[in-house]
């Protein structure tokens, strides 16, 4: 089983510019899920990790460089996630590789990533890969997460490691439906300790969640070392168990690093995924 410490994170890496799917480094989701009480395949949430790649390039058959953006949709049911530096190195391996067209690039991306994401599992599946060519760059929008801004609150913050005890909900009053947003989410890379900056949107129905406590809780991730996907699942599970909403979704959009941004979405009820639209900070 791969571990984060075995990855290329924090290490000097050779940049390979010929197609090399072996660069992908999958990490099992299970160990971190067990920490938050999620065991086996019976998960209390649905969702996906929405990735955007801003630095994809390859050569056409005449050697002329091609560039594109890519949106990836990785189901949260995959037993593995992809360590982000290995994802970057893998994408760089297309740089001097001659390929017929974007469709061939898309097919290789889908095949290679699906193999790594389901590696070691009897279950196999696919992922979403959408290549955005130059002719559609002007259709890529910038849009902020909608919802009531928690950051307006003047709260004292003293805890900088996850503190779920800050979460409270009023079960004595009628249930509500709310969408709350904060741009103050910060955590650190699990291996390198480098800062990860994000915005988070929380939609729920149920007993009204105390907003000051929720903001303080989100701020408490500030010195916490964990990957993006793991932070969002921890936030989901803490709210789900402490506040006991009827429905809940947690969606975070993290600023890009190495030409990639990662935007995990987890929800208690199956439904449509949010649009993968970047925010101003991304």
Curated annotation (Swiss-Prot):
Residues at the active site: 189, 196
Gene3D superfamilies registered for this protein in UniProt: 3.30.1130.10
Keywords per UniProt: Cytoplasm, NADP, Oxidoreductase, Queuosine biosynthesis
Highest taxon above the source species: Bacteria
Role according to the record: Catalyzes the NADPH-dependent reduction of 7-cyano-7-deazaguanine (preQ0) to 7-aminomethyl-7-deazaguanine (preQ1).
Family: Belongs to the GTP cyclohydrolase I family. QueF type 2 subfamily.
The protein, known as: NADPH-dependent 7-cyano-7-deazaguanine reductase
Classification of source organism: Bacteria, Pseudomonadati, Pseudomonadota, Betaproteobacteria, Burkholderiales
Gene for this chain: queF
